[in-house]
Structure formats: structure tokens, C-alpha cells
Amino acid sequence: MQAPDALRRPFTDPEWLYEIKYDGYRCLARIEGGKVQLLSKALKDFTRGYPDVVDGLARLDGGPHLLDGELCVLDRLGVSDFNTFHALRANRIGRRSPPVTYCAFDLLVFDGQDVMHQPLEVRKTLLQLVLLDAGLIVAEPPEDPPRFPHNVLFVDDLPAHADVFRVMVQAGLPIEGVVAKRRASTYHPGVRSADWVKIKRPGWQEGRVWRS
């Protein structure tokens, strides 16, 4: 998986797009013919642990597709809750556990074709189309806390990075930050690339990192 570099100061540049940084568990999702496989950074299979996410991704037509994203627990504002997700993975939450959502932000293989060499903007457009065709994108989630269709969320880019980031910080939303990505960048698996830059919210403390 490609990983972002860290940068503290926000910046605005039309050649970059900006996404909310979801705080959870990085996950590749392979889908083909209704069958889904979920893989960790180290390519360990943990498909059985997230049946609702698997059922949602199984709605994707065609394949094989390979998605990159983050498994998260989302609160009533749609903000990822790392501590709750960690407790869920550690089996410290009972039967009424919160739903896990797959936050998809990139597409690496589309209908069997490697698209990692395509610009990020193209890959995100293809990802959005694939999820739309499967009925996995809605304008507004209908529940509180929001439950996205079949536990899958398309991570769209923010329309105005500097303003949105400032508003989120001033509102006190508990987000880790944003990830800035160069629009024309290709995907480099296993590389910490300067084309992806993590901008942390001031005062944010890093959560625990799993290595699986």
C-alpha cells in the first residue's frame, strides 16, 4: 500500500486534492464475481471479521477490482472513532457493537485492468462510478449515527481545503486531519510517497498503530 508523508502546515494548491483522514485500519479489498477478500497492510486475510462490509462490497459488478481504503467505526457526525474500533477488534464490545464501515479512497485494479499508472483523479472517478453502479453512494446517510449503504463509504475530496480544514478545527471535530494528494499522481505500492501528504489537526495525538 502507498503511504503518505507527514507535513504539519496546511497548504492550498489547485494541483492537489484533499481528503478527510479516517482513523482506523488500512485495508485492501479484492472483489470478483461476488466474492470479497479483505487484506491488511501485510496482506493478512481478515475477511471473516467484517461480514457486513463483505456483503456490501459483494454488490460490485464485474471484477476483479482492487480497492484501497480504511476500516472504521463512525460516530453520529460521520467522524472515525479509533478507540471504539480498537475496542471492537480486541473483543471488548458486546453484542450491540457499532457497525464497521469500509471507507474507500482509491482504486488499483478495475475489471481486471491495473490502473495504478493512471492519475489519481482518473482512479477516483472510476471508483466513484463502480460504487454508484452498486448503489453504495447516497447524498445523505439516513440514520443517526450515519450508517452508509451496506457499510461502504466513498471518500470524496473536499471542495475547498483551506476553508474546510479551518472550519473543522474551529468546530472541534475530533478528526486526525486531512490527506493532501497530488491530482496527477500514480499509485506506488509499498512506498511512502511525497505525492500524498498527511496534514494533522493541531493538538492531535497519534493513536495506536497496528502492524498486521
Model feature map: region roles:
Residues M1-S212:
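Catalytic cores of nucleic-acid ligases and guanylyltransferases
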